[in-house]
Regions:
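Exposed, low-structure sequence patches enriched in small/polar residues
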Residues: 104-111, 244-692
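Short, hydrophobic/aromatic-rich segments at coil-to-beta transitions
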Residues: 134-142, 166-170, 198-203, 341-344, ...
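Extended lipid/amphipathic-ligand handling interfaces
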Residues: 155-157, 161, 186-196, 366
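Edge/loop elements at the starts and ends of beta-strands within beta-rich repeat scaffolds
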Residues: 1-2, 98, 134-136, 150, ...
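Structured extracytoplasmic
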Residues: 1-138, 144-152, 213-313, 317-320, ...
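Short aromatic loop motif centered on NTY/YTY
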Residues: 173-174, 179-225
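Hydrophobic lipid-interacting interfaces of membrane-associated proteins
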Residues: 9, 146, 176, 207-212, ...
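Short, surface-exposed coil-to-beta transition loops
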Residues: 151-154, 183-188, 222-225, 358-361, ...
Length: 692
């Protein structure tokens, strides 16, 4: 068992300050902020501190049961009330690491450690010097990468001659590393000797230089993290229950400690420019021009335009198109008094210029108890939607998939459904990252297009075109390793795509409840897992399983999700049309791998482009029982039969990512069922993303 004190300081600075920047129109009326300009000891560039956060914690651990917990005792930050989410995002970027691991993860990419077992394959090492550090004889070894464009470092370290433990180390990312928006990564670590064989970390410093351009003269941002460790104590036992993580650890006092608290616990005094940040930002918030710039930045980041107590948006969903509605105009908004609101309401209105119909929706949620995060939620929506765009149902009352209104599509996008959905549910989190949900819903479904049918034969053999269905759904979701920010009814996930997810759901169709038509049972399971494959990049895998018990029509079955947009949508089958395959029993597998430029980096004329290799594989097996096939009626009021992928449908893709740092293009190839009418053997899709 062990415990120690931890003091952490995060800082963001505007760098490469010159007269052109100071006199630019952007900072007109805000010239006073440049009184705090300083010079970096690492890069030699000038910088202006813009943001600082301090945190003091007690860390407790037990190596026997392999558990550790960090108790935050104080947190202080400059700037705005929404800074906490920003702080948590930055902390995730600067996650703790162990230099002895084979790969060190920064900005969601894995660098090969110079102390890795495989380091000899990617680094050259040179013995430079030897000397006493304290009373320990140490060797000074420099290292540098064997090849360009790989995720590697250069630097040196001092290692003890008897224990081979590192006493000091610095790491500087290779300038040619395939990394976006980052010009520089520099790390220093120092260790002290506890006894003859144990070295404990005492200081960890990391600087990152972010910029849209790699040129040294370009303006950018420094992100700096300085961490001190002190007061190590050992063999102080704690009960295993002590290490249980709190679901909602927020305490008001922790974020409002007096100045005396910080004077007593800071392990390094603030510099003059760091002290000035707190006062400068308080003044900056009163400058009208800065308020305007902040509003524009918030709009780009969140997609919402902020008013007092209300946000309009999201602005990126204002325009859409499908063959039923034609051009679609959507306006929406949400209540928003702060990121930790205990309740929130959302709504929207939409109009299709082709069908001349108005659609709308309203939802609300309230955090009724912070203990175990008990939430009540519900809503109503009347809309046009592309159902069957995913295998695992979400029942998000205001959620609308990208397939419903893609501006550019492939083939006929007319298999749309007119839906009226009402939901009421309860959710709780009895254990951290383990949520339980019970949801009641009622849907009315009918075809929104004359060229698509959801009709079916009822028990009397009559044809019905409208389906009414009440359901009760139980669901559990487990997301180990998920990190969130906030303590209100909504929390922001700050490490999305970095943790596995397990979902298990059971749905009971309630016949005759609110004139519901069918009685049935549905079981669904979903497992997603990201994998860091060392120097070979990053892999994402998904497995979905489902089974329906009972006789139900097309509107309630499980169509295999096609993709007729030109966007790459994960967990869909790009070369399938909507409703090409329908099932009541299914198993699907998705794999997508990003090599991170590992292969292109070895080709001289491609190396400078920093492109990244993408490959994917998708497969699905499914069955459709005879009762669930023969119940359906086509647009001509005659029986219609649907095909299921009993011979495992599959497709694969290969592409290039990081084009202009934001664009990925994938070429998709259909593997079988090549004799189906109107199929697409080959397709091209794209995606936009901001990633390191």
């Amino acid at each position: 068992q062990y415990t120690y004190d931890k003091y952490e300081k995060l800082e963001f600075d505007l760098n490469t300050i010159d007269s052109g920047l100071i006199n630019s129109r952007t900072f007109r009326g805000m010239e006073f902020i440049f009184d705090q300009v300083d010079t970096s000891r690492i890069t030699g560039n000038t910088y202006l501190p813009l943001f600082i956060n301090e945190a003091f914690s007690k860390v407790y651990g037990d190596n026997i049961i392999n558990k550790e917990t960090e108790v935050l005792e104080g947190n202080k930050n400059s700037g705005f009330e929404n800074n906490q989410t920003f702080i948590e995002l930055i902390k995730d970027l600067y996650a703790d690491f162990d230099i002895y691991d084979n790969h060190l993860k920064f900005f969601n990419v894995a660098f090969t450690s110079p102390l890795s077992k495989t380091g000899i394959n990617v680094y050259n090492y040179v013995l430079l010097d030897s000397a006493y550090l304290g009373d320990k004889w140490c060797y000074n070894i420099i290292y540098y990468p064997r090849r360009k464009n790989e995720l590697t470092f250069k630097g040196d370290f001092w290692v003890n001659d008897s224990t081979w433990a590192v006493k000091e180390i610095n790491l500087q990312a290779s300038k040619s590393a395939n990394l976006n928006w980052v010009r520089e990564i520099y790390i220093e670590q120092e260790y002290d000797v506890l006894n003859d064989s144990t070295f404990l970390i005492t200081k960890d410093y990391m600087l990152s230089d972010f910029s849209f351009r790699k040129k040294e003269s370009a303006n950018g941002m420094y992100g700096k993290r300085t961490t001190f460790y002190d007061n190590y104590e050992f063999d102080i036992p704690k009960e295993e229950s002590f290490y249980k993580e709190n679901i909602d650890p927020y305490e008001f006092e922790v974020y409002n400690r007096p100045d005396q608290f910080w004077e007593e616990r800071r392990m390094e005094a603030l510099s003059k420019d760091e002290k000035g940040v707190y006062k400068m930002l308080d003044t900056l918030k009163t400058v009208p021009r800065f308020k305007s710039l902040y509003t524009i930045g918030a709009l780009i980041a969140s997609g919402y335009y902020e008013f007092k107590g209300f946000d309009a948006g999201p602005v990126f969903s204002v325009l859409g198109y499908n063959e039923v509605e034609g051009l679609r105009l959507r306006l929406g908004g949400r209540t928003y008094f702060g990121q930790n609101d205990l309740w929130r309401m959302e709504g929207f209105g939409a109009f299709g210029f082709k069908d001349q119909k108005f659609k709308y929706g309203l939802s609300g949620k309230v955090l009724v108890s912070k203990k175990n995060r008990k939430i009540l939620f519900g809503g109503y929506r009347k809309d046009i939607e592309q159902t069957g765009a995913s295998l695992t149902n979400s029942k998000d009352v205001l959620g609308r998939n990208r397939a419903s209104s893609g501006l550019i599509t492939v083939g006929a996008n007319d298999r749309l459904t007119s839906i009226e959905l009402t939901t009421l549910g309860y959710q709780m989190e009895p254990v951290k990252n383990f949520t339980f949900r019970v949801l009641g819903s009622h849907r009315t479904l009918k075809s929104a297009s004359e060229t698509f049918s959801l009709s079916y034969y009822d028990q009397n053999g009559d044809i019905k075109s409208t389906l009414k269905q009440s359901e009760l759904e139980l669901g559990i979701n487990y997301t180990p390793g998920r990190k969130t920010s906030g303590y209100g009814v909504e929390r922001r996930v700050i490490n999305g795509g970095d943790f596995p997810s397990f979902f298990l759901g059971y749905t009971f169709g309630l016949e005759d409840v609110l004139q519901s038509d069918f009685d049935y049972h549905r079981i669904q399971a979903l497992y997603t897992q990201p994998w860091n494959v060392g120097g070979l990049g990053r892999l994402y895998t998904t497995i979905e399983l489902g089974r329906i018990f009972g006789t139900i029509p097309l509107g309630l079955l499980s169509p295999i999700p096609g993709n007729q947009t030109l966007w790459s949508i994960y967990n869909t089958f790009t070369q399938l049309d909507y409703y090409e395959f329908v099932s009541d029993t299914y198993a699907s597998f998705h794999l997508k791998h990003n090599f991170g430029g590992r292969l292109f980096g070895r080709v001289p004329w491609l190396r400078e482009l920093n492109l990244r290799e993408l490959v994917g594989f998708r497969a699905v097996w499914g069955q459709l029982s005879e009762p669930n096939n023969s119940i359906n009626v086509g647009i001509d009021n005659l029986p219609i039969r649907y095909q299921s992928p009993e011979d495992i449908y599959w497709e694969w893709s290969a592409g290039v990512g990081n084009i202009f740092k934001i664009l990925a293009i994938e070429f998709n190839y259909r593997g079988n069922y090549l004799n189906n009418p109107g199929i697409r053997k080959i397709g091209v899709t794209g995606s936009l993303s901001f990633s390191f």
